[in-house]
Amino acid sequence: MKSTLRISLKAGERIFINGAVLRVDRKVALEFLNDVTFLLENHVLQPEGATTPLRQLYFIAQMILINPEGKDHSTAMFRKSITMLLTCFKNEEILAELKRIDALVSTGRAFDALKAIRGLYAIEDNILNNHELPPTMVEQIRREIAPWR
């Protein structure tokens, strides 16, 4: 980290820091003075929210961040998932971004990968609503890359 990072949390808000979950009891500002892996509560996707292929990929990438002891397993799941998604999607924008997301995770930048995945949700929703990705394929992806269910 080149400089300090300051974030503000509201009372009752949670933050995931290096695998630990913290809840603050009052409004507080945190200042990170060195490198840290964190995820704000409003960016955490619960398993039941991982209902589309990209949301499933997001869930797996977030596990790399918030579960350090399971990082190797989550990274292996991510590799399997990204490979599958690269063969299923036909949209050039999604394909290019998936390759960039893969590179981000490969270089230890899972947080940036999460942001990039969220940026693809609208395109994915459009693809799914127009049945450009057949529902049977979506279901196959769901079964293949959703072992937490």
Curated annotation (Swiss-Prot):
Keyword Mitochondrion on entry: no
InterPro entries: Flagellum_FlbT
Keyword annotations of the record: Bacterial flagellum biogenesis, Repressor, RNA-binding
One GO biological process term: bacterial-type flagellum organization
Signal peptide start-end: none
One example GO MF annotation: mRNA 5'-UTR binding
Role summary: Has a post-transcriptional repressor function in flagellum biogenesis. Associates with the 5'-UTR of fljK mRNA and promotes its degradation.
Family indicated by similarity: Belongs to the FlbT family.
HAMAP family: FlbT (MF_00783)
NCBIfam families in the cross-refs: PRK00794.1-1 (NF001995)
The name this protein goes by in its record: Probable flagellum biosynthesis repressor protein FlbT
Originating organism: Rhizobium etli (strain CIAT 652)
